[in-house]
A protein has these predicted regions:
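Membrane-interface helix-loop junctions and terminal tails of multi-pass membrane proteins
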Residues: 1-178
Length: 178
């Protein structure tokens, strides 16, 4: 149960801080907003990797859990439970953010609670960006945490968090990076 709760808390932190930064920056597509949002997501992953990584592996994302499962590093029961607890953590974070937004009118301006300027992109571009960027992120996570590639796992959290920053820098323009 401890590893499932760690995933819930880690996903809460990632969602609350990453999406909280996006909301605080009014989900803007200006350079400062994009960089700030990307940094918030990446640094959240780095912090959680070193906080809960030893407990659960710090997947904090169902796509990562699916990749770990498909690579044979995790059984189906744990993968399913991770995804359930990750979803619960994300829902709690979204609820807390909603409460904060609705009690602070300055955050309910422009597009802070809905589609941003990225909404003008077509579905194909968005789907292509999401699939490719998710693949790249899972690829980095699996490589950085592999025991057979000679990588120093002490730095896996840093490599993963920095790659998430890069993924957001690219993906925010297309979809807002889910």
């Amino acid at each position: 149960m401890k590893k499932y709760l760690a995933e819930m808390v880690g996903t809460f932190v990632l969602t609350f801080l990453g999406c909280g930064a996006a909301v605080s920056l009014n989900c803007g597509v200006d350079t400062a907003s994009v960089v700030g949002t990307a940094m918030a997501f990446g640094i959240s992953v780095i912090a959680m990797a070193y906080t809960i990584g030893g407990i659960s592996g710090c997947h904090i994302n169902p796509a990562i859990t699916l990749g770990v499962f498909l690579s044979g590093r995790m059984n189906g029961k744990d993968a399913g439970m991770y995804m359930v607890f990750q979803t619960i953590g994300a829902i709690i974070a979204a609820a807390v953010l909603s409460l904060l937004v609705w009690t602070d009118p300055s955050l309910v301006e422009g597009t802070a609670t809905g589609a941003n300027a990225c909404a003008s992109n077509n579905v194909f571009n968005g789907l292509l960006a999401e699939v490719l960027l998710t693949f790249l992120f899972v690829f980095v996570v699996l490589g950085a945490t592999s025991k057979t590639n000679g990588a120093t796992n002490n730095f896996a959290g840093l490599a993963i968090g920095l790659s998430l920053i890069l993924i957001h820098l690219v993906g925010i323009h297309y979809t807002g990076t889910s």
